Amino acid sequence: MGGQKTHFGFSTVNEDEKAGKVAEVFHSVAKNYDIMNDVMSAGLHRVWKHFTIHTAHLKKGDKVLDIAGGTGDLSRGWAKRVGKEGEVWLTDINSSMLTVGRDRLLNEGMILPVSLADAEKLPFPDNYFNLVSVAFGLRNMTYKDAALKEMYRVLKPGGTLLVLEFSKIYKPLEGAYDFYSFKLLPVMGRLIAKDADSYQYLAESIRMHPDQETLKQMMLDAGFDSVDYHNMSAGIVALHKGVKF
């Protein structure tokens, strides 16, 4: 790892440079991340996350790992599902995002363990969690295969991985979606977050992310069984689910 080339949006960079460049993006957008999510998706990200939470079928006392948990939307939902006897870890590789998420949850009276963690080298034991989730984070990881194998490792047998991520939209809508992503989104980033470049990268990173079938195969290759996905909003996002047997 490290000597090869990879993509950073539409640009090509050394593999060992990508993580630092992605970190710069999320340090920049952290404070405005929630409001930009609402503006960018017209609030739909809340619906997508709500669906994800209801898909999990958690029970009281379960253990959950929220990878790239950012500002804590999923962690909040998981904590309500598993109760005080459960365990939910909010993790992110970016300290700015993790701080915003931790503080936001504290302001709501919710105390959860947090960890500044790299998904490709998770600091958790084997066979520990009932559920691992990653929402809008996998596409930013340099070594996605390694991250998926780590998620598999920390899951208990019978545990579930949920990957909520931007995906490939239905073909008839591609033109309109491209116009929105590459013309309007950077303008909104400049006006609201004073940062057009970061939102240009986010739009480009979506286009470079594996499509639904490719990600399904990647999860199978990482060891998961019963892998399937559910498209939402005409394929703008997809929720992939895999089980460790």
From Swiss-Prot:
Source domain of life: Bacteria
The keyword Membrane is annotated on this UniProt entry: no
PROSITE patterns per the UniProt record, alphabetical: SAM_MT_UBIE, UBIE_1, UBIE_2
List of residues binding S-adenosyl-L-methionine: 71, 92, 118-119
Reaction(s) catalysed (UniProt annotation): a 2-demethylmenaquinol + S-adenosyl-L-methionine = a menaquinol + S-adenosyl-L-homocysteine + H(+); a 2-methoxy-6-(all-trans-polyprenyl)benzene-1,4-diol + S-adenosyl-L-methionine = a 5-methoxy-2-methyl-3-(all-trans-polyprenyl)benzene-1,4-diol + S-adenosyl-L-homocysteine + H(+)
Broadest EC class assigned to this enzyme: transferase
Entry keyword set: Menaquinone biosynthesis, Methyltransferase, S-adenosyl-L-methionine, Transferase, Ubiquinone biosynthesis
EC nos: 2.1.1.163, 2.1.1.201
UniProt pathway annotation: Quinol/quinone metabolism; menaquinone biosynthesis; menaquinol from 1,4-dihydroxy-2-naphthoate: step 2/2; Cofactor biosynthesis; ubiquinone biosynthesis
Transferase among keywords: yes
Family, per entry: Belongs to the class I-like SAM-binding methyltransferase superfamily. MenG/UbiE family.
Functional summary from the UniProt entry: Methyltransferase required for the conversion of demethylmenaquinol (DMKH2) to menaquinol (MKH2) and the conversion of 2-polyprenyl-6-methoxy-1,4-benzoquinol (DDMQH2) to 2-polyprenyl-3-methyl-6-methoxy-1,4-benzoquinol (DMQH2).
Name of the molecule in the record: Ubiquinone/menaquinone biosynthesis C-methyltransferase UbiE
Gene source species: Neisseria gonorrhoeae (strain ATCC 700825 / FA 1090)
Gene name of the encoded protein: ubiE
